[in-house]
Amino acid sequence: MTFWSILRQRCWGLVLVVAGVCVITFIISHLIPGDPARLLAGDRASDAIVENIRQQLGLDQPLYVQFYRYVSDLFQGDLGTSIRTGRPVLEELRIFFPATLELAFCALLLALLIGIPLGILSAVWRNRWLDHLVRIMAITGISTPAFWLGLGVVVLFYGHLQILPGGGRLDDWLDPPTHVTGFYLLDALLEGNGEVFFNALQHLILPALTLAFVHLGIVARQIRSAMLEQLSEDYIRIARASGLPGWYIVLCYALPNALIPSITVLGLALGDLLYGAVLTETVFAWPGMGAWVVTSIQELDFPAVMGFAVVVSFAYVLVNLVVDLLYLWIDPRIGRGGGE
């Protein structure tokens, strides 16, 4: 199997996944009890006003007509218009998506910076106290609800210790940096505004740590398993017999090979972080897509909910496509094996 044939296969998979998400999200969103026109008009509005709003939104048409119109607009890059705000969904996503992406990237960075060293040490000190601690962290991270964990760290670090802010991206008295990327940290650096940078960094610590905690243990366990496999290989025994220092063998021989199979897990982690940001943003009043889509669901804003699902699923599949191609580029044997 050539690189281009695998790329073509993965792209078809991307299209099928996004198409499936569109269909499922459309069906589920329209099965939710309630009338968006009634919510938009208010409880005191007459039936004639509600019916007029329903006609303006196209909600009086059959579902297959609404779906056809939605798909047609989607192919033109139009995600529809928010029922709640009256603005294009794509415009709202451009406002809220950078905040979610910044949070997800920082959480992934924390998970890697902490999880990889823990995984290495856990493999080197196998079945010792650190290895058991990492195992407990992994189980705790997977089993602890992000919502509960977020409330816990807010109560501890903001309520009792009062050493970190409990919500938002910036203090109320600070103006956001000039919008370039939508990432406050990066925009503040580009603007040369150190005060905004450090304030945004303080606000990012608690939500990023909360979001990273789940994947920190997973990354550590994945690195540990891959390291143990590499440390048992013959080339490691030869390196030890050659008199090379132990730390040099671990970092320069075992670790690079252990990172290769871990790439797939890291790609999945970034996709999971985008979805996991929904609850985390709600707890920390983080003005990203999570809080926005929760409000949209509560107010039966179908176009906004479907736009969120399409964008996040596309980002998730795209990240995994890049990871698969990177994995193939690093280890071409996968492509040759697939061809056989």
How would you label these PLM feature ranges?
Residues 17-68, 157-196:
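Hydrophobic alpha-helical transmembrane segments of membrane transport/permease proteins
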Residues 1-60, 90, 94, 121, ...:
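N-terminal signal-anchor/first transmembrane alpha helix
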Residues 42-58, 149-159, 206-211, 248-265:
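Hydrophobic alpha-helical transmembrane segments
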Residues 2-6, 97-130, 176-340:
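Alpha-helical transmembrane segments of integral membrane proteins
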Residues 14, 22, 44, 111-112, ...:
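Residue-level recognition of pore/gate-forming positions within transmembrane alpha-helices
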Residues 117-121, 130-180:
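Hydrophobic alpha-helical segments embedded in or immediately adjacent to the lipid bilayer
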Residues 3, 60-116:
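An internal, D/E-rich "acidic patch" concept
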